[in-house]
Amino acid sequence: YGQRRHPKKLTPLAYKQFIPNVAEKTLGASGRYEGKITRNSERFKELTPNYNPDIIFKDEENTVMNQWPGVKLRVTEGWDEDGHHFEESLHYEGRAVDITTSDRDKSKYGTLSRLAVEAGF
């Protein structure tokens, strides 16, 4: 089956750097806004829960643990319905997530951002 690929060096993202290099709400980044999902909407059933024990959800990925042993991915915001985001926020559709690390070490955020990009977010 060929040779094993060598892992490429991950370059941390800079503060306020986007991949793709466009704002979150633009078509190139996330597609069209499809409308807010509420608990009573049909689309709510399409959301997929994540029960990964390596992720700490603020409301009580293995790549984070590989990068920093003992540190977990911390999701501070995912799907939301409380109305404190801008009107067409992707949080209301379950297409946006805010993340940190369990140790809240801001020096890791650039690399964390790069890991998210490499994972397809």
From Swiss-Prot:
SUPFAM superfamilies: Hedgehog/DD-peptidase. Keywords: Autocatalytic cleavage, Calcium, Cell membrane, Developmental protein, Hydrolase, Lipoprotein, Membrane, Metal-binding, Palmitate, Protease, Secreted, Zinc. Zn(2+) binds at residues 91, 98. The C-terminal domain displays an autoproteolysis activity and a cholesterol transferase activity. Both activities result in the cleavage of the full-length protein and covalent attachment of a cholesterol moiety to the C-terminal of the newly generated N-terminal fragment (N-product). The N-product is the active species in both local and long-range signaling, whereas the C-product has no signaling activity. It comes from the Eukaryota. Ca(2+) 2 binds at residues 61, 77, 80, 82. Its main location: secreted. GO terms for cellular component: extracellular space; plasma membrane. Ca(2+) 1 binds at residues 60-61, 76-77. One of its GO terms (molecular function) is calcium ion binding. It is found in: Secreted; Cell membrane. Signal peptide: none annotated. One of its GO terms (biological process) is cell fate specification. Intercellular signal essential for a variety of patterning events during development. Signal produced by the notochord that induces somite patterning, dorso-ventral patterning of the brain and early patterning of the developing eyes. Displays floor plate-inducing activity. Binds to the patched (PTC) receptor, which functions in association with smoothened (SMO), to activate the transcription of target genes. In the absence of SHH, PTC represses the constitutive signaling activity of SMO. The sonic hedgehog protein N-product binds calcium and zinc ions; this stabilizes the protein fold and is essential for protein-protein interactions mediated by this domain. N-product is active as a multimer. Belongs to the hedgehog family. This is Sonic hedgehog protein. It comes from Rasbora paviana.
